[in-house]
From Swiss-Prot:
Guanine-nucleotide-releasing protein that acts on members of the sec4/ypt1/rab subfamily. GO terms for cellular component: cytosol; membrane. Zn(2+) binds at C8, C11, C73, C76. It comes from Schizosaccharomyces pombe (strain 972 / ATCC 24843). GO terms for molecular function: guanyl-nucleotide exchange factor activity; zinc ion binding. Residues 1-100 form the MSS4 domain. This is Guanine nucleotide exchange factor MSS4 homolog. Keywords: Guanine-nucleotide releasing factor, Metal-binding, Protein transport, Transport, Zinc. The gene is dss4. CDD domains: RabGEF. Belongs to the DSS4/MSS4 family. GO terms for biological process: post-Golgi vesicle-mediated transport; protein transport; small GTPase-mediated signal transduction. Transmembrane segments: none annotated.
């Protein structure tokens, strides 16, 4: 299995450079922030991480709606790069950040 390297879109910092994680479908960031329920939400593809130490360089926001936290670059503080779902202990990094 190859490595996945994600570089911040706003600065040269490497956010993730590790073994390629599984891809999962989860609610989009917009959907999960604006919905009271988790039923029939629009989904997006995310890289699923369970360990925050798998990241090279990420910051986590204060809790938002439904106890979700946004992920951002720890150097420039820009994002969001994905979100943390505290209920399921999942760090979800947007697949769209991968450069082919």
């Amino acid at each position: 299995m190859s490595n996945l390297r994600i570089v911040c879109q706003h600065c040269p910092s490497v956010v993730f450079n590790n073994k390629r994680p599984d891809v999962v479908k989860r609610p989009t960031m917009s959907a999960m922030l604006h919905s009271e329920t988790q039923e029939d939400l629009e989904t997006d593809d995310f890289f699923l991480l369970k360990d925050p130490f798998a990241f090279d360089n990420v910051s986590v926001s204060k809790p938002l709606a439904n106890n979700y936290k946004l992920l951002a670059c720890a150097d420039c503080e820009k994002g969001p790069l994905g979100y943390y779902d505290s209920k399921n202990n999942e760090y979800l990094l947007l697949c769209s950040l991968e450069k082919n």
